[in-house]
């Protein structure tokens, strides 16, 4: 209860802080907003358990940040990795790991910076993409990928940069399809409809990565991907709306298969036994 009150207080303080900054400088307000946008507001307190205690422990440096994770069945028949969502951890994907190990796969699962067991305070889509690329270069070639939410966005962004073919498999679970949608949602959270401040926010994104926020898009990246893609999304997802996913579905890409569920929402979908089995079988 105390934790929830503290979180509400922090959010209220941030809203006021950004509004005050915007009175004096749209740029400063945008800088603060982007900083908050890149920081997970919660971090899981889970510690390794069960199958994670049996794994090889992985620790390495990513852009000056120590990240930590696990590897099972080294030199397995095929390599797979798991990319968690915002404020989540690979510790939430035990069932996927067990299923992939039963198929004889080598499994690599590492918490992204600022998440779970890894160090760091912030991460953006560009950094998460580069994190996936580093995983592939360090432990790969990795041919099978599972990603939920934020992780589901960064997999296509990474794969379009990685040499790959039709043998690769990508399972996207409720991916954050359009970063522009995520940003719109964020501005609602901070209760801002300041157009000029939002324009400065967009300028900052371009300065950091050289591309506008619309570039960080599954619908854009998927056009450049040869891999087979299984895309699972729920009709009642209030975090990453199905409407964005349906625009991709309408394109009828031959390498993309959709599984649309109802009643699972954004989080329960990746925990659903039928979805897990479908994904493990696909990979």
Residue ranges, per PLM feature:
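Hydrolase active-site cap/lid region
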Residues: 162-211
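Short alpha-helix in the alpha/beta-hydrolase fold that links the catalytic acid
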Residues: 96, 227, 241-249
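Catalytic histidine-centered segment of alpha/beta-hydrolase-like enzymes
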Residues: 264-274
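Short beta-strand/loop motif that positions the catalytic acidic residue
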Residues: 225, 231-233, 237
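Gly/Ala-rich beta-loop-alpha elbow adjacent to hydrolase catalytic centers
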Residues: 146-147, 151-155
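Conserved alpha/beta-hydrolase
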Residues: 90, 97-119
